[in-house]
């Protein structure tokens, strides 16, 4: 199997971060069920008891009774996350008891060792230390204070009081339990420092990310990102089509701003917002840019949108050429020439690729300037989850783009008509389609009709 590229690896890790029950009620119900299993299984096997109802109910009562204490130590008092923590922690507790039962059969022991139940409780507590510090925003001291409350309460109501001291002072428990607790503490301490000096606290970043995803609140993460952001001057190019009576107009927009970093942070929906700013009569294309040009906050997004009102016209015209398309191996460049302004579309379709590198843009723009073009607008029509573009493909795209520009210089220009339609009123609510919708531009040039299709679906 070929090694995955970096983009795919990040996508996999992002997907793993979203593994959670769909509802905290599901987590609560599952936690209660698992706690009941722990009580019944431990009582019947490890303790050899025939009375299962009392230990089962006692463990469930301890779980529910201590559950509300967790939110007191969580940074945002989020009950749902606390319930998710209990579900995974109780699962570890139960797995440990099952391992002990399996070990008895595997090693042909005469009886079950309570070590595995006690160890399950300690592993549960260790897990809680890690989660409370990273996800729930507790300090190490608070995490230690709360870590043992739920697992220890469940343990004490399950295990007879005359067995407490012997089970908890077992040398192996002290050794392995101390190791787990030490690892959890060290892991929490070191991971929080992993982002320094650029990042004050890695845990704050994780908590802000979780908040943005679970509560759709971008503010904490935007505040962190803004601290490391820098000012830059960007341009936004527009190709405006207007009817002779000026009653209808339509625009092809190429912002240097790149959509991102991800929903709902910063300019993640910049395409849809520009579309609305243009009265829903625009195609907002992907220019040659990358995630270095993400807007970090909603405030910067609004500043950018307001700046669009300051647009100035560089050139006016009423003619264009018929489209030209040039293919070099996997690379394809297509374009039209509007008077002296070229519109280029670069693609490796149907092959995927990541964002085109800036040098492709600068080299094409320099080539166009040398050929006396007024301006060249370059659209990056890449597939979002493709691999980083190779040197060979990049060179082929440059050759195809230059050949297209040279050919456009020789093409005859014609007056043209345009028509535009989008899905604004079609109620297309699909996960793959963002707020910029789907649109089609029709150009009638030299008595021939050409269509340009577009969807706000890249990121």
Segments and roles (model prediction):
Residues 2-459:
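Terminal domain-initiation and capping elements
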């Amino acid at each position: 199997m070929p090694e995955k590229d970096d983009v795919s690896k990040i996508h996999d890790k992002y997907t793993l971060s979203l593994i959670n029950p769909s509802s905290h009620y599901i987590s609560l119900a599952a936690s209660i069920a698992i706690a009941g299993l722990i009580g019944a299984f431990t009582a019947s096997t490890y303790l050899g008891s025939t009375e299962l109802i009392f230990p089962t109910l006692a463990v469930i009562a301890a779980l529910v009774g201590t559950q509300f204490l967790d939110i007191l130590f969580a940074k945002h008092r989020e009950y749902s996350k606390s319930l998710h923590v209990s579900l995974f922690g109780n699962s570890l507790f139960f797995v440990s008891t099952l391992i002990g039962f399996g070990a008895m059969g595997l090693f042909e022991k005469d009886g079950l060792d309570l070590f595995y139940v006690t160890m399950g409780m300690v592993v549960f507590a260790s897990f809680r230390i890690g989660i409370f510090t990273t996800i729930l925003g507790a300090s190490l001291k608070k995490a230690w204070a709360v870590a043992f409350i739920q697992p220890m309460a469940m343990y004490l109501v399950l295990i007879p009081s005359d067995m407490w001291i012997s089970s908890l002072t077992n040398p192996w428990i002290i050794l392995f339990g101390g190791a787990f607790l030490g690892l959890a503490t060290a892991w929490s301490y070191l991971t929080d420092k992993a982002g320094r000096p650029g990042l004050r606290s890695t845990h704050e970043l994780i908590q802000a990310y979780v908040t943005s995803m679970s509560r759709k609140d971008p503010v904490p993460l935007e505040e962190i990102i803004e601290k490391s952001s820098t000012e830059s001057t960007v341009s936004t190019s527009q190709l405006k089509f207007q009817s002779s009576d000026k009653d209808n107009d339509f625009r092809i927009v190429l912002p240097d701003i790149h959509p991102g970093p991800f929903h709902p942070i910063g300019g993640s929906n910049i395409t849809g917002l520009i579309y609305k700013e243009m009265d829903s009569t625009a195609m907002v294309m992907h220019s040659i840019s990358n995630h270095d040009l993400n807007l970090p906050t909603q405030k910067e997004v609004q500043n950018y949108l307001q700046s669009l009102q300051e647009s100035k016209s560089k050139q006016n015209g009423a003619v264009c050429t018929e489209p030209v398309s040039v293919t070099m191996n996997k690379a394809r460049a297509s374009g039209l020439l509007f008077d002296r302004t070229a519109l280029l579309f670069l693609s490796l379709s149907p092959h995927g690729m990541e964002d085109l590198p800036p040098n492709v843009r600068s080299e094409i723009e320099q080539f166009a300037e040398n050929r006396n073009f007024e301006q060249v607008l370059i659209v990056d029509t890449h597939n979002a989850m493709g691999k980083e573009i190779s040197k060979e493909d990049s060179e082929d795209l440059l050759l195809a783009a230059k050949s297209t520009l040279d050919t456009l210089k020789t093409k005859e220009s014609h007056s043209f008509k345009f028509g535009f339609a989008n899905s604004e009123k079609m109620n297309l609510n699909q996960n793959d389609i963002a707020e910029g919708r789907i649109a089609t531009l029709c150009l009638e040039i030299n008595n021939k009709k050409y269509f340009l299709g577009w969807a706000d679906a890249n990121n």
